[in-house]
Amino acid sequence: MKSIINLLAGSAIVLTMTTAAFADGNVIGVSWSNFQEERWKTDEAAMKAAIEANGDTYISADAQASAAKQLTDVESLIAQGANALVILSVDSGAVGAAVDKAAAEGIPVLGYDRLIEDDRAFYLTFDNKGVGRIIAETVKAVQPEGNYAIIKGDKGDPNALFLLEGMMEVIGADVEAGKIKIVGEAFTDGWKPDNAQKNMEQILTAADNKVDAVLAENDGMAGGVIAALSAQGLNIPVGGQDGDHAALNRVARGTQTVSVWKDARALGKAAGDIAAMLAEGKSMTEIPGAVKWSGGAKGVEMNAIFLDPTPITKDNINVVIDAGHIAKDKVCEGAMDGVNGC
């Protein structure tokens, strides 16, 4: 994980291809897990733009959080003539059948953001363990001890475990020493904010509201957590990630401590460019910036690219404004005093 490639917007590393190389054009099929979360729409726009800029055709399907539908979606994308597939998996355990279908047709696969632990798939994501570390470090700096709750993502998503591993690297020693006590920890079906809110409500009830900080594994769930806290009149440090617009506004308002921004535009563009190269017949080892990685649960060695995330707090809200990720009036609405950029 030390060989991390920074592909944020405006970075020096750009995956380039000539127009001539795509004179005939290829078809890039994208299987999305679901569009429930705000961020995937941003990813899609960037990915589609990159694919079309390369002279290729974008086709897609939305699995609507169903692993079974994702398999039929992949079959449909193959039938429509996809020359390469980008898959944001619903369930890491079930997606193998989709990879088998693609491999049988000689179609390369890019596992997008979520790990598909199969050496036939290229892996493109952010450094999710690093994201977990950043969330925990930022919250711990504000609340170095006391009762913590951890709201994890979906149990079937490897990212939930990578994020947790990163968090525990930061707070694990303090947990063992008794400085930090984990009073509640729960997986959240589908990463859904409503489910996260229910999980947090149950933790608050069990802990008699004695919770001092919350580590949430994404911004949508952080929103659910904060709703549960607000209902009890609590305002405590809460960390999340994705750089969702609503979360960034919560950071400015002071109800969320940090949102680790993973620039979806950079990830989407990189996916479009990598898929184009794979569709043209380049091997995974020929992808610029690719590294060998075997940090998954099964230890499978894979070709991967990891992008660097950026923590956003009240001290650097200006970063997302300056990058054009969110308008100043939107992020700064109701902002507390002392927010840099507002």
What is each residue range found by the language model?
Residues 3-6, 21-342:
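A residue-level marker of the well-folded mature domains of exported/periplasmic proteins
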Residues 14-22:
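C-terminal segment of classical bacterial N-terminal signal peptides
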